[in-house]
Amino acid sequence: MEIKNLIDEDFCNYKKPAMFIGMPKCSFKCDKECGERVCQNSELATAPNIEIDNPGEIVIRYFQNPITEAVVFGGLEPFDSYEDLTQLLSLFACGSQSNYAQTKGMPDIVIYTGYEPEEIMEKLAPYGVLTSFGGDFIIKFGRFIPRRHHKFDELLGVELASDNQYAMRLEDLL
């Protein structure tokens, strides 16, 4: 498995302290649709990938950290690394039931995507089972559009880069 970055304690992408996992692939749909380079993660795209031999170690790191309450998957585009994203989500669900979880339980899961729900609904459907493990499962939808106003999202508790972007709970989509 490869990722772009791993931040054990991130306080910028969600209202709760979170582990941030940057996924390594993107089709750059935001750039293509507006006809200019607008990717907020363009520097990250050129950074080397980080090879993860044992993804379970990421899960253990999360559960051993007393500060974090959520896991955020972000840029590049998590759904362009669907198999790895699914593997990590499954590991977090299993980890929430293990001795590593101690009293933490299932973290809130947040996925930042540039896709719209109708573009990835077939990928979202299998994740429905994960909502039974506890914690919120939130997805931020919408491509970045330059020269649009920023918008505060109540569900995420953060300001989003353009006003067409929004977050929804997975259970409200399925």
Regions picked out by a protein language model, each given a short descriptive name:
Residues E122-R148:
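Structural recognition of alpha->loop->beta junctions
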Residues K4-D53:
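Canonical Radical SAM [4Fe-4S] cluster-binding loop centered on the CxxxCxxC motif
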Residues M1-I3, P107:
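Extreme N-terminal starter segment of soluble prokaryotic enzymes
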Residues I67-Q97, G142-A161, E171:
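Conserved glycine-rich "GG(E/T)P / GGGxP" loop and the immediately following alpha-helix
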Residues G22, G74, V110-G114, G142:
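A cross-family glycoside hydrolase active-site/sugar-binding cleft signature
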Residues S42-I60, F79-G128:
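Canonical radical SAM enzyme core domain
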Residues N164-L174:
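Charged phosphate-binding loop/patch that engages nucleotide di/tri-phosphates or the phosphate backbone
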